[in-house]
Amino acid sequence: MKTDFWLQRWSAGQIGFHQSEVNQDLQQYWSSLSVAPGARVLVPLCGKSQDMSWLRGQGYHVVGAELSEAAVESYFTERGEQPQITSQGDFKVYAAPGIEIWCGDFFALTVRDIGHCAAFYDRAAMIALPADMRERYVRQLEALMPQACSGLLITLEYDQTLLEGPPFSVPRTWLQRVMSGNWEVTKVGGQDTLHSSPKALKAGLERMDEHVYVLERQSR
């Protein structure tokens, strides 16, 4: 996704991708990762997701990455929190108990910036990116995450000849091809979400499959 497009969507309040409730798949499948309480959990392209508060409530330290200042500020304002704000290189970092959100270009983040994250959670990052950016996203994720880490990934798959993203379709075959060399990819859940998307129905799609994956980093 292009930077200007993402910032304009937040500026105009066009955030249909934002979920007002905690994601049910997160609540159902997160325990499959066996991540120790207190661990740092990376949430790429986090927006103002309610899911971050759920993870905080489970005892994790959330490390969010988000391009839009408006999104980050909304997250804290809606919770009545006043974060400590500091500048770290090209990033503005918003911090409060149990969370820090790095506001800036996700692809410019380094391990030195965010420290050791034991796991990641991606509900809306990979599907926000067009095909020509997705493999770059995977490689950046691998650069940020240590060996012996895990992640929960939620994607969509549909006929993109009938409907342009975002959210974009991420075929299972693509995911296996790009990630299976460094990750054990296990599908743990999923459902047809077609009838929850008026745009997809209008486009004439017959299915819009949601896939839920547990990813385990393979040690080298």
UniProtKB/Swiss-Prot annotation:
Q: What class of enzyme is it?
A: transferase
Q: SUPFAM superfamilies per the record?
A: S-adenosyl-L-methionine-dependent methyltransferases
Its main localization is cytoplasm
GO molecular function list: thiopurine S-methyltransferase activity
Task: Tell me if S-adenosyl-L-methionine is a UniProt keyword of this record.
Answer: yes
The subcellular localization recorded is:
Cytoplasm
> Which GO BP terms sit in this record?
methylation; response to metal ion
Question: Can you supply one Gene Ontology CC term for this chain's record?
Answer: cytoplasm
The domain of life for this entry's organism is Bacteria
Is Nucleotidyltransferase given among the entry's keywords?
no
Q: Which reaction does it catalyse?
A: S-adenosyl-L-methionine + a thiopurine = S-adenosyl-L-homocysteine + a thiopurine S-methylether
Query: Keyword annotations for this protein?
Result: Cytoplasm, Methyltransferase, S-adenosyl-L-methionine, Transferase
Q: Which residues bind S-adenosyl-L-methionine?
A: 10, 45, 66, 123
E.C. no: 2.1.1.67
The record's similarity note reads: Belongs to the class I-like SAM-binding methyltransferase superfamily. TPMT family.
Protein name, please? Thiopurine S-methyltransferase
- Which source organism? Pseudomonas syringae pv. syringae (strain B728a)
**What does the record give as the organism's lineage?**
Bacteria, Pseudomonadati, Pseudomonadota, Gammaproteobacteria, Pseudomonadales
